[in-house]
C-alpha cells in the first residue's frame, strides 16, 4: 500500500476544475477500499487509471513546451483526431481520440526508446485481460498486487526522470511569462502560482522538486527579475518543503 500511495506525489497538487479533482479522489477511494477489502482485482483497475492519469499529465506538459514536436508526432492520425488532440483543453480529453497504448508514443519526444515505451505500456495489456471476462482472477492476494504496483512505480519514476527537462522548461516559462505584475493574470503571487503554474501545467510535488533546483540567477539582468524572485520564493514557501 505504501508504494501505491507514493503515486500521489506524482499527481497534480490540485486541479483547475472540481470534476477533475473529484474524479481522481474517486479513483483513490476505489483503490483503497478495494485493497482494504481484499478485492485486489478491482483495486488494480483503479490504480491503473491513476497510473494512466499520471501519463496523460506528462504528455500534457510535453504538448505545452514541445508543441511543434507534438504536432509532428501526430503524423498518420486522421485530421479530425489531430485537431481534437491539439485543441484538447485538458489531459483527460486525449483518450477521446487515443487508445491507452497509443499515448505512450509521445514519450519518445523526451528521449524514451521503444524498449522504454514497451515497459511503460505493458500494464495496458495486463489491464485489458482483467477488464474482460476470462474466468481467472489475476490478482488474488496482496503479494501479487503489491508486486504489480512496485513494478508500475518503477516505471512512473523512470518517466519522471525523463520528464525533468520538460518540467524545468515549464517552470522557466512560467517565471518569465508571469514576472510582470502589471501584465500577468493575478497580481497576488499565490494566486498566479496556483492558476498558471499548478493548474495550467498539472504540476505535482515531484515536479516542484525539479522546479526548486532551477537557478533563477540566470535571469538577474531581466527587467522583471524581482517578479521572478517573488514567484520562485512563493513556490518554495507553498510547496517546496512539503
What do these predicted ranges mean?
Residues 18, 106-173:
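Charge-enriched, short contiguous segments at helix-coil
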Residues 22, 26, 98, 122-125:
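Generic alpha-helical secondary structure signal
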Residues 40-44, 55-67, 139-140, 165, ...:
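Short, solvent-exposed secondary-structure capping/transition elements
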Residues 1-46:
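Charged alpha-helical initiation segments
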Residues 49:
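Gly/serine-rich nucleotide phosphate-binding loop at the start of the catalytic core
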Residues 1-5, 143-242:
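Terminal, compositionally biased low-complexity regions
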Residues 5-18, 52-112, 133:
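Short non-catalytic regulatory patches outside canonical folded cores
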